[in-house]
Structure formats: C-alpha cells, structure tokens
A protein has these predicted regions:
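Bacterial N-terminal signal peptides
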Residues: 1-9
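Cyclophilin-like peptidyl-prolyl cis-trans isomerases
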Residues: 12-247
C-alpha cells in the first residue's frame, strides 16, 4: 500500500503545469495572471523578470480610465512625485508576437512599446487592459474612422460587445497573457485620480511572484473541476524538489 501511494505520488508530481502564472499584489488587491504559450518570447522574458524581483515596488505610472493601467518602468521605483515616467527599461526589445485571435479584451496583458515599424516590445513595460463595452454602432464607427475601413472579425465584435476591451490596439501590440482572477483590481486602479500626464496622484505600487509548481497544478486542476493535490507525499516532494518549473 505504501509503495503504491509512493509511486502514484511520484507520477503525479512529475506532471508539469501547462502555463506560467504570476501573482500580482497591489494596494487595491491581488490578481493572478496566466502567461500565454503562444507568445513564448514575451512569456519567458516576463517570467524571468518576475523571478528576479524586477517588478517589486514599481509603480503603475500611467493610468487611463476605460483604457488601461501601465507599469514596468524601473525608473518609477524611487521616482519623485509628479515626475514624468515611461522611458525606462532594459537595454533590449522583444520581437513582436502579435497573434490573430489573441485580442485586447478586458483583463489581458499587453507589452508596451515605442513607435517602431517592427512593433518590437519594451523589455519590461506592460499594460493591463480595462477598456469598455461597445455597441454594434460603436464598432461600426470605429471601423470607419479609427481603423480606416478595416473590418473587425466576428470574434472581435462579439468579445468587445460582451466583455469589452480596446479593439483599436489589436494587431499593433503583443498580447501575452490574461488575468484569471482579480480583474476588479484593474477597475480600482483605473479609477484613481491622475495628473495631466496620467500618473496617479497617489502612488500605486506592485509586487509580483511566480506561482509554484504545486500552486499552478492545483489552479489548473480547479479549472477542470478536480480536487487539488495535497497530503504527506505532496508536501514531501515539494520540500525536496525546486518549487519552480520550466515549460
């Protein structure tokens, strides 16, 4: 019996989660972010920076209600009040990984960038989408005036009517993940008062931590309606093996 339990525990522990997950803590609450495997360069870069503690104590330095909240500028960690931010980051860019069908619906995370023809992303700056819901008439108007006649897909129209988001960013910026909990945190931060440069008048800081192998597996099991893995052997293997994992 003991041997059977041991072998079963070994087999289940050998399983890997399907995605990387990040816990984002803010003064307005906690959110859990899932990183997309369809955008591996952005996924791996964000995973690396979170693991290094890069984002801890940085500000959401640009906040626009019904649009997005932006952070990831390392210059924001010790920035004085009212100082303009948004130009800091690592000395590299990430090649664009813009995917058809991965769109700017509410709760997604996108990579910020400067104006460059290759649409390369900032090495660290990101935004969480709030956006808003649209009507058919509103989307028709967007197609005509903002998108210069480009037609939205059925998926885009349905998503932006039912969930909301920022459709005019589609195809221009890389979306590389989504919040699976804590979307209300985005709404709360997006509602704060800001200055003329869209910087919050009261600093909104962040801290990030990767979910462990066990936390990620249990999160995915819960999404499938399964019981979380627990018990003596699970705790034993967690203590003997690195809690981190690689995809």
């Amino acid at each position: 019996m003991f041997l059977s339990l041991l072998l079963w525990s070994l087999a289940t522990y050998a399983q890997k989660p399907e995605h990387y997950y990040v816990r984002i803590n803010t003064g307005k609450g906690e959110a859990i972010l899932k990183l997309y495997n369809e955008t591996p360069k952005h996924r791996n870069n964000f995973h690396k920076l979170v693991k290094e503690g890069f984002y801890d104590s940085l500000l959401f330095h640009r906040v626009i209600h019904n649009f997005m909240i932006q952070g990831g500028d390392p210059d924001s960690r010790y920035a004085a009040d009212r100082v303009m931010l948004g130009n800091g980051g690592p000395d590299y860019k990430i090649p664009a990984e813009i995917q058809e069908g991965i769109i700017h619906r509410k709760g997604t995370i996108g990579a910020a960038r400067d104006n460059n023809p290759a649409k390369q992303s900032s090495g660290s700056q990101f935004y969480l989408v709030q956006g808003r819901k649209f009507t058919d008439a509103g989307l028709d108007s967007l197609e005509t005036f903002r998108l210069k006649g480009k037609k939205l897909t059925d998926l885009q129209r349905r998503t932006y009517k039912e969930i909301g988001g920022v459709p005019h960013l589609d195809g221009e910026y890389t979306v590389f993940g989504e919040l699976i909990s804590g979307i209300e945190v985005v709404d709360k931060i997006a509602a704060v008062k800001t200055d003329e440069r869209d910087r919050p008048l009261v600093n909104e800081r962040m801290a990030m931590k990767l979910l462990t192998r066990r936390e990620a597996i249990n999160l995915e099991r819960e999404a499938q309606g399964l019981e979380p893995k627990s018990g003596f052997f699970t705790r034993l293997f967690d203590s003997l093996k690195s809690l981190d994992y690689k995809l």
